[in-house]
UniProtKB/Swiss-Prot annotation:
GO molecular function ontology, one term from the record: structural constituent of ribosome
Gene Ontology cellular component annotations, sorted alphabetically: cytosolic large ribosomal subunit
SUPFAM superfamilies: Ribosomal protein L29 (L29p) (SSF46561)
An example Gene Ontology biological process: translation
Membrane-spanning intervals of the chain: none
Classification via InterPro entries: Ribosomal_protein_uL29, Ribosomal_uL29, Ribosomal_uL29_sf
UniProt signal peptide: none
Protein name: Large ribosomal subunit protein uL29
Keywords assigned: Ribonucleoprotein, Ribosomal protein
Domain of life the protein comes from: Bacteria
Family the entry assigns: Belongs to the universal ribosomal protein uL29 family.
Length: 63
C-alpha cells in the first residue's frame, strides 16, 4: 500500500484500515509463534503498512 493511496482516504477509512492491519499483525504473530507461518516477510510488510497509516493519520490531524 502506497502513502499516496492513503492520503486520498478519509480519517474514518484510515482508522478502519489501521484496525484491520493490527488484527492481521496479531494473527500473523500468533501463526509465527505456533510455527504455522511460512511467509515471515508478511510481518515486516504489515508493520510498515501500519506505520504508513499512522503517519498519514498524524499528517491529517495536523492540518
Amino acid at each position: 500500500m502506497k502513502a499516496a493511496e492513503l492520503r486520498n482516504k478519509t480519517q474514518e477509512e484510515l482508522g478502519d484500515e489501521l484496525i484491520s492491519l493490527l488484527k492481521e499483525q496479531f494473527n500473523l504473530r500468533m501463526r509465527k509463534a505456533t510455527g504455522q507461518l511460512n511467509q515471515v516477510h508478511l510481518l515486516r510488510k504489515v508493520r510498515r503498512d501500519i506505520a504508513r497509516v499512522k503517519t498519514v493519520l498524524n499528517q491529517k490531524a495536523g492540518e
